[in-house]
Amino acid sequence: MKTLVLFIIFGLAALFLLSSANELEETERGCGLLMDACDGKSTFCCSGYNCSPTWKWCVLDCPNLFLLPPTKTLC
């Protein structure tokens, strides 16, 4: 009997956690961060990120900073 009550309590807790996670996913923030999906029309990237036309996700504004010599910058 005790284990049945524990299973019911844990089941309700898991159901609550899943429903709250789903609610957070549905009410996402207004802009996307790194590798969030975007299309440039209805979903946008936050400042510091651009929507990649190739992959349709948010990428950094300056992706090649580590490949350039220290004297040159893209931004």
Curated annotation (Swiss-Prot):
Any one of the GO CC terms: extracellular region
Propeptide: 22-29
Superkingdom, taxonomy of origin: Eukaryota
Signal peptide: 1-21
Compartments it resides in: Secreted
Keyword Signal set for record: yes
Organ and tissue specificity: Expressed by the venom gland.
GO molecular function list: ion channel inhibitor activity; toxin activity
Primary localisation category: secreted
Keyword Acyltransferase: no
UniProt-listed Pfam families: Toxin_12
Cystine connections: 31-46, 38-51, 45-58
SUPFAM superfamilies the UniProt entry points to: omega toxin-like
Family per record: Belongs to the neurotoxin 10 (Hwtx-1) family. 43 (Jztx-49) subfamily.
Domain notes per entry: The presence of a 'disulfide through disulfide knot' structurally defines this protein as a knottin.
Annotated protein name in UniProt: U9-theraphotoxin-Cg1a
Organism: Chilobrachys guangxiensis
